[in-house]
């Protein structure tokens, strides 16, 4: 399939494997699109390499930086987003709140967006989480929050905040994105 680049670390590939196999649960027959830019190219490359181990229906797109979060990607990128079922966005600026992302989601794409992701945070930061454990923990917290009107968060280091939930919508964003139209950020 794909020959690995020498500068991609094992830690980056391990995290990419988690994104591809656990978070997105990519299947062999799926079309996968990885969108990156010059500032996040190392991360995009590692995601491409790992996805290429699962499917040969993969495309890596390097787009110019958008200069600010929420700015629409170039038209060719937006067009190709609508044609893929699995989209990984590893760019400096967020594409989460763009019409291109919304349209792709509406048409059934599942999308993982990682705005601002860099090599260090990809290798050693939150992306290295155990997503199966995280999914269970967040699901349990969602049940708790749905039943409470008042929430208090405190810690030994001095955190002490309380707020009313007011019947707000509970979003269980646990990093797992395995259904059409789903997005994880």
PLM features per residue range, with description:
Residues 3-185:
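Active-site bordering "gate/hinge" segments
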């Amino acid at each position: 399939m794909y020959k690995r680049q020498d500068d991609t670390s094992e830690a980056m590939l391990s995290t990419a494997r988690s994104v591809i196999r656990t978070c997105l649960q990519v299947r062999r027959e799926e079309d996968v699109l990885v969108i990156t830019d010059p500032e996040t190219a190392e991360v995009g490359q590692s995601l491409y390499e790992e996805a290429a181990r699962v499917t040969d229906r993969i495309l890596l797109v390097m787009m110019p930086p958008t200069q600010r979060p929420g700015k629409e990607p170039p038209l060719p990128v937006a067009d190709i987003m609508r044609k893929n079922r699995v989209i990984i966005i590893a760019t400096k600026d967020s594409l989460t709140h763009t019409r291109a992302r919304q349209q792709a989601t509406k048409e059934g794409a599942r999308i993982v967006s990682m705005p601002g992701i860099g090599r260090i945070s990809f290798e050693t930061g939150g992306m290295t989480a155990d997503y199966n454990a995280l999914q269970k923990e967040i699901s349990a917290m969602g049940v708790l929050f749905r039943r409470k009107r008042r929430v208090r968060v405190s810690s030994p280091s001095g955190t002490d905040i309380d707020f009313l939930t007011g019947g707000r919508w509970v979003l269980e964003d646990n990093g797992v994105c395995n259904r059409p139209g789903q997005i994880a950020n």
